């Protein structure tokens, strides 16, 4: 049975002496709010997914012809692998490149076109954009993307975790590290450090599992 946010929020409430646990609805001490804790939990889960790559998503997106910048999926966080698919359904890997590599491969790449791209690159500026070079001209072509997607945002309404069940405690301790590390009356750096250690342990174990990751179709 999947673990929900209400279950973990109740555990967090009991650990922080915020009552017996009501699924994260109330925080009597006033040191944290429901919105704040839900934000911590969601952010920590996304960080875990991005850093470990234990859960991949596969998605095919049609290429916009004669254009280098291709829109990435709205839930994209990190690219794992991209392949070019032609009209005949044949796939070929697109290597990840940077601007210097592209300069060596084809000095005119910023405005060049070709039936199929030779690679892709991503920049920090446009996080939901994948650049393919040269700009593709082949009709009915597409990108086959394998990427790490954002986890489901928590709402305290019984949302399932987006990580395998065995790593839910890791997310819990990551959330607690954020809660105890905040500036203000709730700050307890000793507890924050202890929770951070538990978080780090789970994170490193998950990285070992990443090569045997599974897909969300």
Question: Model regions: which residues?
Answer:
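Glycine-enriched, solvent-exposed interface loops adjoining structured elements
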Residues: 1-217
């Amino acid at each position: 049975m999947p673990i929900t946010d209400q279950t973990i929020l109740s555990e967090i409430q009991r650990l922080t002496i915020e009552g017996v646990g009501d699924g994260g609805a109330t925080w009597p001490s006033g040191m944290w709010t429901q919105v704040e804790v839900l934000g911590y939990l969601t952010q920590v889960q996304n960080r875990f997914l991005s850093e470990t790559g234990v859960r991949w998503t596969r998605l095919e997106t049609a290429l916009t012809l004669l254009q280098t910048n291709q829109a990435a999926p709205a839930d994209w966080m990190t690219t794992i692998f991209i392949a070019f698919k032609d009209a005949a359904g044949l796939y070929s890997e697109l290597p990840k490149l940077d601007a210097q590599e592209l300069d060596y491969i084809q000095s005119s790449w910023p405005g060049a076109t070709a039936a199929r791209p030779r690679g892709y690159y991503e920049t920090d500026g446009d996080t939901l954009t994948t650049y393919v070079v040269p700009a593709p001209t082949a009709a009915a072509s597409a990108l086959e993307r394998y990427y790490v997607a954002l986890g489901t945002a928590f709402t305290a309404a019984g949302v399932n975790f987006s990580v395998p069940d065995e790593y839910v405690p890791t997310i819990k301790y990551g959330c607690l590290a954020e809660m105890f590390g905040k500036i203000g009356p709730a700050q307890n750096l000793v507890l924050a450090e202890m929770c951070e250690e538990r978080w780090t342990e789970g994170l490193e174990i998950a990285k070992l599992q990443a090569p045997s990751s599974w897909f969300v179709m």
